[in-house]
A protein has these predicted regions:
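ATP-binding/phosphotransfer module of carbohydrate and carboxylate kinases, centering on a glycine-rich
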Residues: 2-143
Length: 143
């Protein structure tokens, strides 16, 4: 085992996608190959590579489970915004995977979870947009 414990933060990120690919390869008794980038895994999955498709399926399902757990933990009942460098590349996978099922599958809370929207932020610099909006609101002309 490369890591003694795998945190949510270590798993649901670009390097986590690569680590998951390597772990699933080793479990299957297959050689994970040389150095990989997250974009390699997503590109190979889009081309139909079964190992990469499986990696994305597992990644999206775990992502959904973690996002759902965070709603229950924080009470974010109005919605969850998915952000990060991987999100734009994963949109199709997220929509056609177990993401939403795992997000909603929370026992007696499942009906409430089904009403919580999940939205993807795909702008490359959402923080800059937010800062600009804040500047206009704070320092712009008052009407």
């Amino acid at each position: 085992a490369q890591f003694g414990r795998v945190s949510n933060e270590r798993l649901i990120c670009g390097p986590g996608l690569v680590n998951l690919y390597r772990a699933l390869s080793e479990i299957a008794g297959e050689d994970p190959g040389g150095p990989l980038e997250p974009k390699d895994v997503t590109a190979r999955a889009a081309a139909g590579d079964p190992r990469c498709v499986r990696t994305l399926d597992v990644f999206c399902a775990v992502f959904g489970a973690i996002a759902g757990d965070l709603v229950l933990t924080t009470g974010a009942w109005d919605g969850v915004f998915l952000t990060g460098g991987l999100v734009p590349r994963l949109l199709s996978s997220l929509q056609h995977s177990g993401f939403r099922q795992r997000f909603e599958h929370k026992g007696r809370f499942s009906p409430a979870m089904a009403r919580v929207p999940t939205l993807a932020i795909v702008h490359p610099r959402p923080g800059l947009l937010g800062a600009a909006a804040f500047a206009v609101e704070s320092f712009g002309p008052k009407t």
